[in-house]
């Protein structure tokens, strides 16, 4: 809240407040996994240490009220007996002699520290907002945010200086993935949480095309594009969709469809499904879109600038 107020948020009313004590009791565990990750000798050990940190967030956010018990039955009498219970929440019959009955639990043990997940999200947002508002927007007057994800930003930066000289040695960045011959290479922050890494390792980006949330394509100076399209098979995204297709969809207001094949299962029986699915679309009902030549700007509905368009 203090950060939001410093950034200009107007607080009109406080409905209720919580008082609590804070301490970095989780820090030794996070630091341990960070050291294990940095000292890992193979990709598996590195990913395992990373998972131990990331999965902690998910485990603290679990809703234990949704836990169920599954009973496997092989005779009709047992199935009927369980189905008559008040805590029965459903059942699935696999064949004439096998069924699974879903039961709600009699006792729910509220043993998950839900506040931990809330605190992790809050601290993460504080770091992200601090970087965007207090560094990027102050350092580059004409910076434009292209998209953001949970822990990443994509910017269009206009500057008269050499951008790589600007950011060299900056406390916000981790340059450990740069080539060793690059002037900015520095592995002192390698795999340490809390720093921003250049996803293209010092390679300039030629073009960015954003269609909708989680549907964009980035074309670097060299190498293959990085593209996302939510709900689209990886094979279609990497092999069938080109960066030019994203541009054609945006400027030509054209929708693309592709045939996709996936493996599905029902009652533990596997089968393949072929479907024709929309892969690219420039239409979005979640944002107000303005256009100035080849430049598009989106605003959330209710934004004060919309009335001036």
PLM region descriptions:
Residues 1-309:
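Conserved acidic
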